[in-house]
Amino acid sequence: VITAPPPEGVEFDAAFAPVRRAVLAETVDRRRRRTRWTFGAVGSVAAVTALATVLVAGNVTGATDSVPLVGTEPQAASAAEVLRHAADETVRTSDPVVGPDQFLEVRIAEQSQAFLTQRYSALVPYSLTVYRPGDPGADWTLVRTSEDPVAFFPASEAAAAEAAWDAEPAGWPTGTIRAADGAFYDTPWTPAELASMPRDPDALYRWVSEHATGSASHEEAMTVLITDDLSTGMVPADLRSAMYRVLARIPGTAVTHDAVTLDGRRGIGIGRAEPNRDGEHSEVVIDPDTGDFIGTRTLTGAATGTLPAGTVIDSTAVSSTVVDSAP
């Protein structure tokens, strides 16, 4: 049992720094299963500190002018119709054909929040570019980049927050990694369950419901499981189609027209507001004409001390193409 009060001010910052560094190094490595945490599962000051640090994917505070909130409020009535249409279009779409001497290049760009001190944070852009070889025996390649912050928070104290960054930059891990089967972090990049997941929408709904755990609600857990798999850029068209139909059936699913991903592409946002997170709205963004998955967005629900309701606090863009070489 912990009886000592939590550290504050300078003492907190000193205790927080090594935890932040460790989690920053691990978070990108584990992005393929970003299970949402709740404070109900936290039982110590240390765990609360770790939790606050893990939420670097834009769940707490922050926004960026380069990812504007565009479009109408989510409308639940049309979500199922939009997703069914996207599923139909996806079935008509062929997966990229990668020759034996070529690579499937999948680029994931994101702006995510890194906490600098107990009070200050920064919105830090980074990217993960994966090269999957057409030759099954060849190594995969992962290229990681991290850039300087595009914003500091709170905005009213941006200069002080920037000084905290300058004192100890909290960028994401960078560099190039090569590994067989894309096992850059001990497990393959492509989720192992993709091959065995049912393609029948009813069977897939049951599968997702049985395997979804660890979020603020079961509905959120189901949404996160599907979103994480889609975010790898490795889900084949037939499974994407079934996943869209499953999303359409998750209670609370809504559609936001004219959503925007990080690289400026426009699509339809499909997601839900989580009541246990003050209405925070997380969504996948799809191209309604092709059924392609093009990114994700997270928007604030209730207004906070620094952010109005409906602010985009996290945005990703996922794109893929076939290339002739890897770095």
Positions of PLM-derived features:
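N-terminal export/targeting signals for secretion/compartment entry
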Residues: 1-81
